[in-house]
A protein has these predicted regions:
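Short, flexible loop/hinge motifs at secondary-structure junctions
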Residues: 1-167, 236-237, 243, 294, ...
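Short, amphipathic alpha-helical "recognition" segments used to contact nucleic acids or chromatin
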Residues: 169-183
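Gly/Pro-rich turn-and-neighbor structural signature
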Residues: 92-112, 116, 188-287, 352-418, ...
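Mobile genetic element proteins and their domesticated derivatives, centered on retroelements
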Residues: 36, 108-111, 145, 176, ...
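Short helix/loop capping segments that flank catalytic or ligand/cofactor-binding pockets
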Residues: 116-119, 153-156, 244-246, 268-270, ...
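Conserved beta-strand -> loop -> alpha-helix junction used to position metal-binding or nucleic-acid-contacting
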Residues: 234-235, 291, 296, 304-341
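Flexible loop/turn segments at secondary-structure boundaries
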Residues: 184-186, 215-217, 242-246, 267, ...
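Acidic/histidine-rich catalytic cores and adjacent linkers
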Residues: 297-299, 340-509
Length: 509
């Protein structure tokens, strides 16, 4: 074997080793994602051990030097003075109706006249009665005047109904929709439950028609929610895949449920059969001017460029953090240092939320504290990229490249106090659809995707506003047939909760 051949073999061996290492990293990352702990929380003591040998340029938010200073947390407010004691919920909810059962002792029942009552002992337990169907019969008496036999009789008109000549009522329709889109129960399961437990036969095809017509009735409310979300000039946006049935082929294709909304406000679901940049034209209208916060998917950049300077993209720190978290197995020390700097960024955000800081104060604090951490992170990432210490295709190399490619968008939140540090709030809104997708696997044809988007929008905004979706939908379905378009703004979940003085759920904030 010649020297040249030996060199080629050594290079090939080196390449194969690198490729094998990359494949092992990807396999380990996939195994952790499927079987491992889902939490991305960091252990402070573990990171301190890893960072003992890391030279740090100086403290971020604490005094001194070294890894202990780098890991020092920003001072938190005194919990004893700032945190409110949690309200202890009653063992049995006070609002429930009471069914009282009196149990008399046997000696008293045998001779009640010989006994005198001196007190009682009361105990309560929680009981449940299953839901039940009932036949709602509407009787409209006819009348004629006593002395005018030939006069036209009078009779009360039938109340307006969503579905004429249908047996469904607002209550039943609300129950079917809530069961599917809130409790993730497919129509075929509802069909089985109603028949086996109640002996009521409701074919799934009939229920599907009712759901479709209900979505059509709710479209004006959906459009009103969308209009209110877009008028704020700041939206968070993400998309999730959902399979739908391809007409005439019996096969499924991949569609996408795009989700966008404003933190602490409403959210909108939008159905498209792809995730191309052109889909965003149907989501953000031409007149929209403002900030769109999203992940690093290329379609967002292409769309923003097509709108010139009308749309500013803000990045998502959580996506960047997740990639470094997955790269810890490859080189724990370097990702650990980066992750802790990001932890300091999130600690600042937590303090701002605890103090209920407004947009101006948020921007000022971020400019004085968060920007310093971001600058340090940027210098470190550039140094790591220049050193070529990590292969570009490795988990760490990919994390570095992704962070640097998104850096300009990650800085946007520093100067605008309205913005969040990441896109997690809109991703949380998508989670219920993932649970439903596991149960019903795919939706009907593409048109069903649009109806699902409308109904998911209503259900999710009820949840965010602390409303019972069943009660809300039942009342709305009762009122809608008698309402005009200009009255729609008064029956959105937001307006409904405001009239009832309901505080939005903290989880949605």
């Amino acid at each position: 074997m010649s020297d040249a051949e030996a060199v080629l073999l050594l290079e090939e061996l080196k390449r194969l080793k690198q490729e094998n290492e990359l494949l092992r990293q990807k396999l380990d990352a996939l195994a952790r994602r499927i079987f491992g702990v889902k939490s991305e929380q960091l252990d402070k003591n573990q990171l301190l051990l890893l960072l003992q040998e890391v030279e740090t340029p100086g403290p971020v938010l604490g005094k001194g030097s070294g890894p202990e200073a780098e890991l020092a947390e920003p001072p938190r407010p005194n919990k004893a003075s700032s945190s409110k004691p949690r309200d202890r919920k009653p063992r049995l909810p006070e609002h429930l109706p009471v069914v009282e059962e009196v149990i008399e002792p046997e000696p008293f029942k045998a001779a009640p006249q010989e006994w005198r009552r001196i007190g009682e002992e009361v105990s309560e337990r929680l009981d449940y009665e299953p839901a039940k169907f009932l036949r709602r019969r509407t009787v409209r008496p006819k009348y004629v005047k006593r002395h005018e036999i030939d006069a036209v009789p009078v009779i009360a008109p039938l109340p307006n109904s969503l579905l004429e000549r249908s047996v469904v009522t607002p209550g039943l329709l609300a129950q079917i929709i809530v069961s599917k889109y809130c409790d993730h129960m497919p129509l075929y399961r509802q069909e089985s439950i109603y028949w086996s437990r109640h002996e009521v036969w409701l074919p799934r095809q009939t229920m599907a028609e009712w759901v479709g017509l209900a979505a059509d009735w709710l479209k004006p409310i959906y459009r009103q929610i969308r209009e209110e979300v877009l008028e704020g000039g700041y939206v968070q946006i993400d998309e999730t895949p959902i399979r739908y049935l391809e007409p005439g082929h019996g096969k499924t294709k991949l569609g996408y449920l795009w989700t966008y909304g404003t933190p602490k406000e409403d959210v909108v679901f939008h159905w498209e059969t792809s995730r191309a940049a052109a889909c965003l034209e149907n989501i953000l209208p031409v007149e929209f001017r403002g900030v769109a916060q999203c992940d690093g998917y290329q379609a967002y950049r292409s769309f923003a460029r097509s709108r010139d300077d009308a749309i500013v993209l803000a990045g998502c720190m959580a996506h960047v953090r997740r990639k470094f978290f997955e790269a810890q197995e490859q080189a724990p020390k370097v990702p650990g240092w980066i992750l802790w700097q990001m932890r300091n960024l999130y600690t600042i955000e937590s303090q701002l939320r605890e103090t209920r800081a407004g947009p101006n104060l948020r921007a000022a604090i971020r400019g004085s504290q968060s920007r310093m951490i971001m600058n340090r992170l940027h210098h470190t990432l550039i140094a790591l990229k220049t050193s070529r210490r990590f292969l570009p295709r490795s988990l760490m190399g990919a994390a570095i490249d992704y962070a640097l490619s998104q850096w300009s968008t990650l800085l946007v939140y520093l100067d605008d106090g309205r913005l969040e540090i990441d896109n997690n709030l809109i991703e949380n809104a998508i989670r219920p659809t993932a649970v439903g997708r596991k149960n019903w696997l795919f939706i009907g044809q593409a048109e069903a995707g649009e109806r699902s988007a409308i109904l998911y929008t209503i259900i999710e905004n009820c949840r965010r506003r602390g409303l019972d979706p069943f009660s809300y939908l039942k009342e709305v379905f009762t009122r809608l047939p008698s309402m005009t378009n200009w009255q729609v703004k008064d029956i959105t979940p937001k307006a409904w909760a405001r009239r009832q003085c309901i505080v939005p759920l903290q989880a949605a904030a």
